[in-house]
Amino acid sequence: MVGGEGLSNGYKYRLQQPLQTAPGKFDENIAVGLDYLLAEMDKRQMKAVLHFTNTWEWSGGLSQYLEWNGYPATPFPKDPSFDWNKFQQYVAQFFTCEPCKEQVDTYIRYVLARTNTITKKPYVQDPAIMAWEIMNEPRPMTLAATPAFETWMRHTAALIKSLDKNHLLTTGSEGDAASDRKIDVFERVHSDPNIDYLTIHIWPKNWGWFRDTATVKGMPVVIGKARTYVDNHVVVAQQLGKPLVIEEFGLPRDGQVFTPDASTKLRDEYFAAMFGMMKAHPIIVGYNFWAFGGTARPIPGQVFWKKGDAYMGDPGGEEQGLNSVFDADKSTWAVVGKYLKTMK
């Protein structure tokens, strides 16, 4: 992501150092951090895909814009009284909040007007950036909000392309899981000529495809459902004549044990199956597994992130180590390496 929005408002698991501290107010130190990241990626011939905001509360996201414009406090997921339907209804208000949408436009203009302080390259000309995404996992959240959601997506895509004609643009979509399995919403959003390629995310655990990854007999169901999900969205990509990227997919370690010494046999099997789908569907042009955990490690006896902990691939409100692939996960890296060889 480009950066978070808003300072802490009582939700302790959110990003602690946002780029946008208040509407139209930006922390230059954080912006320089992004400059540094892009400069280092460029040295290594790596490419960034950057999204501007988030459906979810852990980076501020749409909820933060609502709070900035006088809406009640966000109903946070870790609150004992949390209600998923109320959260959806809350976030859906963003798409009819005119000042909220204007503030996102201001944020986008700020980012796309920036010149990297290290490389001196304007962001709109930076080869380290492969693509922009409108947001992470855009969802209308309610059926009633769908028309306003689609209108906002088209508006935002047009704004980004008007400011940057050099980079690719995509949505950041999960696929039809974002719209109660109404794949026509996914198709309409990606039919926009300003959108260059399609994205999907696949989350077997979050979507209730299994109860325990230690149960080997459950893996055929997981892999079968993943294949069906991919196949359904491949059809849309083929109809639109645009490439498809599977840009988020992950699985916990065996038995949902989060420590690095726990087996990743089932995760490795899942990754191999996902990578293998490209052979059957050449319109799939890339993958991004979730997520790189690096040298960070879960802290014994602690489930969620606390201030001062090392960052890994899992957002602070998720179990630390849940989907992270650590630097020492040799078998998983072997699967990834085998796939990379087929791409060369």
Which residue stretches match the model-derived regions?
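Active-site mouth of glycoside hydrolases
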Residues: 1-209, 219-243, 249-336, 343
